[in-house]
């Protein structure tokens, strides 16, 4: 049973969501089960999030797949404008995002706000860089011919993020994918889901179309297994432990996914 209200004193309480974002809708797990999230300083339960299984994760992937053609068809400038609005909204709501982050992750409020600003900078950067994914023209080994290289979005991507930087690692992975026309699924760490969900609220307000960005929560074994085995997911980005990274690499190898791995404390 989900808590009916957030105990946090936010300027905008609607940023605190105890639901997952799938296809533009805020939904619960099919089973009705949820996972409590605790304040590491006090042990107090600050809220609960849905315990998604493979079926719900599959629907998130399908939502991203359905949104992909229209999103990739937009001009890079059009995608950039949406991301710029998201950048502005993150900064405008920095105090609330910092409070959510501190409550679930435990870092000092000043550090949390610093991370929010840092997280926003990734969105700003890729909003502009997405307009410069040019491609290339390469000389051929025959006279009068050239090789044209065109850069295209890979399709649906998945991002699995850690607990220690619950905002910055999401925007660092999400920003470039969205900027170049990919659609994705974000699976935040189970200890720190509310920061990710709040960013999802702001992404909706910025005008991000339904299904372009989906945010799921639930047991890592079930959600991760679907993300790594589903052939629709063409790319996986993971930041976390070397032990878990090895498992994900092995799972992704079966469908030959593109992978980006940032493993261990010295990655």
Residue ranges and their predicted role:
Residues 82, 175, 180-191, 195, ...:
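Short loop-to-beta-strand entry elements in the cores of soluble alpha/beta enzymes
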Residues 55, 92, 96, 107, ...:
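Short alpha-helical
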Residues 156, 205-267:
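Conserved NAD(P)+-binding/catalytic subdomain of aldehyde/semialdehyde dehydrogenases
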Residues 74, 160, 187, 216-218, ...:
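Structural motif
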Residues 44-133, 144:
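Glycine-rich loop-to-alpha-helix module at the N-terminal edge of alpha/beta enzyme cores
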Residues 136-210:
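Conserved small-residue-rich beta-alpha loop and adjacent elements
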Residues 1-48, 81, 85, 135-160, ...:
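Terminal low-complexity tails and localization/encapsulation signals of metabolic enzymes
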